[in-house]
């Protein structure tokens, strides 16, 4: 299975231009709220009509404005789990799942397929319960079963964990991760949570303001986001202005110090990204050594955040230090921090 999307849609405040391809794996669409992620899913599902463009799923045209093709949602083979999914409260789990088989007219076939899905989603013992009698995780499994029972060619999840309490989120995420791994087709997962995207998806699409900024393998995008916006969305705390010196050297604003990069520095480079865990104390003469002055310290359950300022007193630099145990003391603030050339990401 593969998905090709190239559409435009005028929205309030910006024009959505979604142009990407997704293969038969789980692909995250990462972006801030209101950037067009969810609208992209609705256009693929046929709920919203794009102004122009083309959508092709596994060689089958779902939408083509030039050829006046616009298949209705029920003919697209698309399964979409909304952020605020709703189960029918007056129906049992089994009855809710059967709603996903309305196109199947054979009653015996419907019953057999429903039983198969209840078993696959570990809902057999809950089949006669009503939604109000289920936990949040059980409700979500039921909603997914209702979608999957119809054997969609593509599965799309819109912020599937946002409504769950934090203690439940990891449990449900693990269950969904196993489901995605066994789906066998294209999966699109819309999220603004970089950790969810990293754990669950092999590929990633980064969006901002209706535009696709970056596509590629998830680890590849994290290692080389290419733009300052994509770097921020993937959690990079240190985005430092710079000027290009040569193909592998920049000069940092605020430090007036050179940094050597392993990656080639493009002519368009205006900043570099360094992740907060990638710094380490170093000697003044060490390569890529930066003089720093401690500004503040904060403690998390499993790490410390140390925020420094540059010699100019304005530029901030984050250093995250993992704890060896919960009672570990705050690390001593160094006078110099350094990082390896391969940890520095050129950004445009």
Segments and roles (model prediction):
Residues 5-26, 30-32, 38-39, 46-49, ...:
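Non-catalytic connector elements of ABC transporters
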């Amino acid at each position: 299975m593969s998905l090709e999307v190239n559409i435009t849609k005028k929205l309030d405040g910006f024009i959505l231009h979604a142009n990407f391809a997704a293969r038969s794996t789980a692909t995250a669409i990462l972006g801030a709220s209101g950037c067009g992620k969810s609208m992209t899913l609705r256009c693929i599902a046929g709920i919203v009509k794009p102004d122009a463009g083309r959508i092709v799923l596994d060689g089958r045209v779902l939408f083509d404005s030039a050829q006046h093709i616009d298949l209705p949602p029920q003919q697209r083979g698309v399964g979409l789990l909304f952020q605020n999914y709703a189960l029918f409260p007056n129906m049992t789990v089994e009855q809710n799942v059967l709603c996903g088989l309305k196109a199947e007219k054979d009653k015996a076939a419907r019953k057999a397929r429903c039983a198969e899905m209840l078993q696959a989603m570990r809902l057999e013992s809950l089949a006669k319960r009503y939604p109000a009698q289920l936990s949040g995780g059980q409700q979500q499994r039921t909603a997914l079963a209702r979608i999957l029972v119809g054997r969609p060619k593509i599965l799309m999840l819109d912020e599937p964990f946002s409504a769950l309490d934090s203690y439940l989120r990891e449990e449900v995420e693990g269950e969904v991760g196993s489901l995605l791994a066994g789906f066998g087709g294209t999966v699109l997962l819309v999220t603004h949570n970089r950790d969810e995207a990293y754990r669950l998806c092999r590929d990633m699409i980064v969006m901002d303001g209706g535009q696709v900024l970056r596509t590629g393998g998830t680890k590849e995008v994290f290692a080389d986001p290419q733009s300052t916006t994509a770097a921020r969305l993937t959690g990079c705390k240190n985005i430092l202005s710079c000027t290009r010196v040569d193909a592998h050297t920049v000069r940092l604003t605020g430090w007036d110090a050179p940094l050597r990069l392993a990656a080639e520095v493009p002519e368009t480079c205006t900043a570099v990204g360094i992740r907060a865990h990638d710094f380490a104390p170093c000697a003044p003469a060490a390569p890529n050594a930066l003089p720093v002055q401690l500004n503040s310290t904060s403690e998390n359950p499993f790490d410390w955040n140390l925020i420094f300022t540059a010699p100019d007193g304005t530029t901030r630099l984050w250093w995250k230090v993992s704890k060896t145990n919960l009672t570990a003391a705050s690390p001593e603030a160094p006078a110099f921090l350094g990082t390896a050339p391969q940890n520095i990401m050129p950004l445009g």
